Amino acid sequence: MIVEKILALRTCANNMADHCGLIWPMAGPVECKFWKPSGLHENGLTGLLWGKGVGAHLSAHADARWVVCEVAVDEMLQLAEEGMIKFPRATVLFVGNRSQALDYIAANMPLYGAALQLAAPAAPAHVHMPAAEPSAPATQATSATLPTPATPSTQATPSTQSTQSTQSTEATQSTEATPVATVAAAPPPPGQQHDVMAKKTETGVYGSTLTGADQSRLVAGYGSTETAGDHSDLIAGYGSTGTAGSDSSILAGYGSTQTAAGRSTLTAGYGSTQTAQEGSRLTSGYGSTATSGSDSAVISGYGSTQTAGSESSLTAGYGSTQTARKGSDITAGYGSTGTAGSDSALIAGYGSTQTAGSESSLTAGYGSTQTARKGSDVTAGYGSTGTAGADSTLIAGYGSTQTAGGESSLTAGYGSTQTARQGSDITAGYGSTGTAGADSTLIAGYGSTQTSGSDSSLTAGYGSTQTARKGSDITAGYGSTGTAGSDSSLIAGYGSTQTAGSESSLTAGYGSTQTAQQDSSLTTGYGSTSTAGHDSSLIAGYGSTQTAGYDSTLTAGYGSTQTAQQDSSLTTGYGSTSTAGADSTLIAGYGSTQTAGSDSSLTAGYGSTQTAREGSDVTAGYGSTGTAGADSTLIAGYGSTQTSGSDSSLTAGYGSTQTARKGSDVTAGYGSTGTAGADSTLIAGYGSTQTSGSDSSLTAGYGSTQTARKGSDVTAGYGSTGTAGADSTLIAGYGSTQTSGSDSSLTAGYGSTQTARKGSDVTAGYGSTGTAGADSTLIAGYGSTQTSGSDSSLTAGYGSTQTARKGSDITAGYGSTGTAGADSTLIAGYGSTQTSGSDSSLTAGYGSTQTAREGSDVTAGYGSTGTAGADSTLISGYGSTQTAGSDSSLTAGYGSTQTARKGSDVTAGYGSTGTAGADSTLIAGYGSTQTSGSDSSLTAGYGSTQTARKGSDMTAGYGSTGTAGADSTLIAGYGSTQTSGSDSSLTAGYGSTQTAREGSDVTAGYGSTGTAGADSTLIAGYGSTQTAGSDSSLTAGYGSTQTARQGSDVTAGYGSTGTAGADSTLIAGYGSTQTAGSDSSLTAGYGSTQTARQGSDITAGYGSTGTAGADSSLIAGYGSTQTAGYDSNLTAGYGSTQTAREDSSLTAGYGSTSTAGHDSSLIAGYGSTQTAGYNSILTTGYGSTQTAQESSSLTAGYGSTSTAGYDSTLTAGYGSTQTAGYKSTLTAGYGSNSTAGHESSLIAGYGSTQIAGYESTLTAGYGSSLTTQQNSSLTAGYGSTEIAGYASTLMAGYGSSQTAGYESTLTAGYGSTQMAEHSSSLTAGYGSTGIAGQDSSLIAGYGSSLTSGVRSFLTAGYGSNMIASYGSSLIAGHECTQIAGHKSMLIAGKGSFQTAGARSTLIGGAASVQTAGDRSKLIAGADSTQTAGDRSKLLAGRNSYLTAGDRSKLTAGDDSTLMAGDRSKLTAGKNSVLTAGANSRLIGSLGSTLSGGENSTLIFRCWDGERYTNLVVRTGEQGVESDIPYQVDDEGNLVGKADDDLVLDYDPGMILDGQCSPGTGEELRDV
């Protein structure tokens, strides 16, 4: 009994390595060097106790080794997994497969004391394994010991020491005849019921047949046949046939045939045929055929045919054919054909054909054809054709054709054709054609054609054609044509044509044409044409033409033409023309022309022309012309002209002209002119002119002029002029002037002037002036001054004193004193004192004192003091003091002090102080202080301080400070500070600081700071800082900083920074930074940074960075970076980077990068990169990369890469790569690759590759590859490859390949291959192959193959094959083959084959075969075959076959065969065969003599009268001596010819049947 020990089961890899890399022994102790007693699997050895538990950590590989080891109990740790233990060391007792290991544990458990404590049955233990591959068989050849449960002699016996194992003592007798070892199994131990499997190992020799039992290992030789039972391992030789049971592993040679049961592993050689069942894994060689059951994995070679059951995995080589059922996974090589059942996944190579069942996934290579049913997922390569069932997803490559069932999703490459049914989703590439059923979604590329059923959604690329039925949604690219059924929605690109059914929605791009029926909605781009049915909605772009049925809604862009019928609504852009039916609504843009039927509503933009019938509503923009029918309503913009029928309502903007008939209602804007018919109502804006018929009502704004006839009602605004006919009523605003006819009623606002005739009624507001005719009535407000003619009525305010001449009207306030001249009007406040000359008008507040000369007009606030010269006008606030010279006008706020000289005009706020020179104008806010020279004009806000010299004009906000020189103009915001020299103009926002020298013009926003030199112009946004030299012009946005020298012109956006030298021009976007030298011009977008030296011109987009030298010109897109030397010209797209030295010219697309030396010219497409030395010219397409040294010229298509040395010229197509040294000329088609040294000339077709040394000339067709050293000339057709050394000349047809050393000349036809060393000359026809050494000359016909060493001369006809070493001369007819060593000469007729060593001479007739060693001479007639060793001489007749060793001489007649050893001489007659050893001479014919050296074989061909026989004798045997001539006599005896005839008693060793026995000729040739 073994105590304190247990058995553990574990697995290792086939090389006995565990997962940590430790190599376990086949038997004996093993230990972990990094032991840690933790609960983790790391840092220790693991296994299952007694082989029971969860086997998740055991290997599932078929070739895994199952190890049983012995472990000490006290060193064992229990892990978390059921049955898993960990230990630091163990002793390996057994290695085998799974079943063997479990049998071993079950057999040996009774020997262990620890096992007796387990409550487990004695049956074998079982390991719960996950689903895995079948285990590999264990064989005697793969284990150190092969134990069985009952044979201690064949297994390691557990012991207390656990360190020893008993080796097998059974020996295997091995013999040559039977190389099979058999080990028999002993009976199992008592109590154990296990199947005992025979263990067998068989090794087969050449052509052997092997049959093995179960669990056998068979190794088979060439062409063997194997048959093995279960759990076998077979290794098969060439052409073998293997049949193995389940759980077998087979490795097969070339051309083998294999049949394996389930759970097998098969690896097959070239051309093998495999058949495997369930759970098999097959790997097959080239051209193999594999048939596998379910759960199989198949990997097949080139051209293989595979058939796999369900849940299989197939990987196929080139051109393979695959068939797989349910759950299969197929990966197919080039040109393969795959057919898979449901739940399959197929990945197919180029040109493959795939057919998959439901729920399959197909991925196909180029040109593949795919067919998939329900639930399939198809991804197709270029030109593929895909047909998928319902619930399929197809992604197709270029030019593919796809057909999918319902609920499919299709994505197609360029030029694809798609057909999909219900619920499909299609995304199509360029030029694709898509047809989809109901509920489909189509997205089509450029030029695609789409046809979709109901409830579809189509999105089409440029120029696409779309047709969709009910419920479709179409989005179309540029120039597309869309036709959609009812409930459709169409969005069309530029120039598209759309036709939609009822309830459709159309959105069209520029220039599109749309046709839609009932309930459609159209949105059209620029210049589009729309025709929509009833209940439609149209929105049209610029210049569009729209025609809509009734109940339509039209919105048109600029210049559009619209025609709509009943119940339509039109909104038109600028200059549009609209014609709408009854009940229509029109809104027209600027200059539009509208014509609407009855009950229409028109709204017109600026300058529009409107015509509307009965019940129309017209709203017209500025300068519009409106003509409306009866019951119309017109609202007209500024300067509009309106003509309206009866019962119309007109509302006109500023300066409008209105004409309205009976029952019209007119409302007129400023300066409008209104003419209204009877029963009209007119409301006129400021300065409007109104003329109204009888029973009209007029309401006029400020300064309006009104003329009204009988029964009119006029209400006039401030300063308005009203003339009303009989029975009129006038109400006039402040300062209005009213003239009224008889029986009129006038009511005037404050300060209004009223003139009324007989029977008039005048009511005047405060301070109004009323002049009334006879029978007039005047009511004067507080302190009003009234001058009234006879029979006038004056009403005076409280306490006023009124003095009026005849006909005057006086209204005086209480306590006021009024002295009025004749015809004067006095309005006096209470307690005021007024002294007025004749024709004066005095209005005084209470307690004020007014003194006025004749013709003066004084209006004084309470307690104010006013002194006015003649013809002066004073308006005083309360407590103010005013002193005015003659002809002056003073208006003062309360408490202000005003002093004005003659001819001044002063308006002062309360508490202000104003001092004005003669002829000055002062307007002062409260608390302001103003000092003005003569002829000045000052306007000051409250608290401001203004000081102005003679002739200045100042307008200041509150708290501002202004100092102005003579003849200056200052406008200051509140809190601003302005200092101006003479003849300057300053306009400042609040808080700004402005300093300007003489003759400057400054306009500043709030908080800005401006400093201007003389004769400068500054316009500053708020918070900006501007500093300008003399004669400069600065315009700055808010927060910008501008600094400019004299004569500069700066325009800056907000937050920008500009620094300009003298005579510079800067235009900066917001946030930009500009620095310019003198005489420069900078224009920058927002956020850009520009730096320019003198004389530069920069125009930059937003975010760009520009640095320019003197006299440079930069134009930059947004985000671009430009750096230019002096006298350069740069034009950059957005995001580009430009760097140029002096005198350069750069034009770059967006995102491009250009670096140019001086005197260079660069034109770059978007995303291109250009680097040029001085005096270079570069022109590149988008995405190209150009690098050129000085004086180079590069022209490149998009995506190309060019690198040129100085004085080079490169012209590249798109996607090409060019590299050239100095003074080179390269011209490349698209996709080509050219590399040239200096002074080279390269011309390349598209896709070609050229590499040239200096002073070379290369001309290549498309797709060709040329490589040359210096001074070479290469000319190649398309697809050719040329490699040449220096000073070489190569000319190649298309598809040819040429390689030449220096100073070589190669001329090749199309498809030929040429390789030559230096100083060689090759001329080859099409399809030929030429290889030449140095100083060689090769001339080859088409399809020939020539190989030559140095100094050789080869001339070959078409289809010939020549190989020559150096110094050889070969001349061959067509279809010949010549192989020669150095310094040999070969001449061959048509169809000959020649092979020669060095210094040999071969002359062969047609269809001859010659093979010679060194220094040989062979002369052969036609159809001869010669084989010679070195320095041999052979002379043969026709159809001879000669084989000789070194230094031999052979002479043969026709149809003879000679074979000789070294230094032999053979002479043969007709049809003789001679075979000799070394140093022998054989002569053979009918009755010929043969001589052989030592160990030679002599073959005699004899005729016995019935048939030929071959007699073979060997020297040294049976009395046949070496170097003795022999012959066969008539009796068939071998006769020696030494001295006398000697008849030998000879038993022939080999007699060959002469009746062409199979293999006879081949045997002789092999010998």
Swiss-Prot record:
GO terms for molecular function: ice binding. Residues 130-195, 270-329, 356-378, 449-474, 502-529, 594-620, 642-668, 689-716, 738-764, 785-810, 833-860, 929-959, 977-1004 are annotated as: Disordered. Residues 270-282, 302-325, 356-373, 449-469, 502-519, 594-613, 642-661, 689-709, 738-757, 785-805, 833-853, 929-949, 977-997 have a biased composition (Polar residues). Residues 130-185, 283-296, 520-529 have a biased composition (Low complexity). InterPro entries: Ice_nucleatn (IPR000258). It is found in: Cell outer membrane. Keywords: Cell outer membrane, Ice nucleation, Membrane, Repeat. Its main location: membrane. PROSITE patterns: ICE_NUCLEATION. It holds the Pfam family Ice_nucleation. GO terms for cellular component: cell outer membrane. It is a peripheral membrane protein. Belongs to the bacterial ice nucleation protein family. A structural model is suggested in which the ice nucleation protein displays a symmetry related to that of ice. Ice nucleation proteins enable bacteria to nucleate crystallization in supercooled water. Contains 153 imperfect repeats of a consensus octapeptide A-G-Y-G-S-T-L-T; further on a 16-residue and a regional 48-residue periodicity is superimposed. This is Ice nucleation protein. The lineage of its organism: Bacteria, Pseudomonadati, Pseudomonadota, Gammaproteobacteria, Lysobacterales.
